[in-house]
Design a protein with these regions (language model features):
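His/Asp/Glu-rich metal-coordinating catalytic cores
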Residues: 2-9, 13-87, 102-225
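Metallo-beta-lactamase
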Residues: 85-96
Length: 225
């Protein structure tokens, strides 16, 4: 396991599991403390060079084949290679666990609950981020006036590979077996994960609590561990 965030911090969870060449990220979220050092409500990364800023500030890990190819090509960070990341397992759709999904390649499968998908859809519809789709930023075409224009809308929109998981229904991602178990939290659709690898088992608690409407689910997860 490589921890690219979420250690001695609130949020920013980005845990990379590598077993026999199968590579899975668990969450891809924002660290509030880290972002707060550099950005504010009205000051964020540069729109067309955001990946450069996130690398230079040490907010995102430099892993080729992980990020959206239009950004990677723009900053001369590859973009034409195959990805080695097999999937992202999303515990839930709070920004400290999912905020950086818009930076990812669209062909990396994202496994999440139906509730998490709906929450991210709301992010897409009410904001400018791209959780369920990717809109290529640098695609251009020759318009009717013979001038170069930037393509927008459906011409540049690519759907992401969203895979809906079901509670307590195990599945496999190559050599890793995944068991998604519901837990109680302040939003619906939260899942903890138990991963079975060739080197042993890993439990990711997500954010959980022992009170609320689904407290029994949290107890069941603890027992399963």
């Amino acid at each position: 396991i490589t921890f690219h965030g979420g250690v001695k911090d609130i949020g920013g969870n980005k845990f990379l599991v590598d077993s026999k060449g199968t590579k899975i990220f668990m969450d891809f979220g924002m660290s509030f403390s880290q972002e707060g050092q550099f950005f504010s409500q009205f000051l964020g990364p540069r729109t067309s060079n955001s990946l450069i800023d996130m690398f230079d500030l040490g907010i995102l890990p430099k892993i080729k084949g992980l990020y959206r190819r239009d950004y990677a090509r723009h900053m001369d960070f590859g973009g034409n290679e195959d990805t080695e990341i097999d999937a992202v397992l999303l515990t839930h759709a709070h920004v400290d666990h999912c905020a950086y999904i818009p930076y990812l390649r669209e062909d990396i499968p994202i496994y999440c609950s139906e509730e998490s998908k709906l929450i991210m859809q709301n992010f897409d519809e009410t904001g400018s981020e791209q959780y369920l789709t990717l809109k290529e930023r640098f695609q251009v075409y020759e318009n009717n006036k013979g001038e170069i224009s930037r393509a927008t809308g459906d011409k540049v929109t690519i759907p992401r590979k969203i895979k809906i998981l079901e509670s307590e229904k195990p599945f496999s991602i190559d050599s890793i077996d995944v068991n998604p178990l519901p837990v109680d939290h302040s939003i619906p659709g939260v899942h903890a994960f138990i991963l079975h690898t060739s080197d042993g088992s890993i439990a990711n608690t997500a954010d959980l609590r022992f009170h609320g409407r689904r407290a029994d689910d949290t107890e069941k997860f603890v027992e399963a561990c």
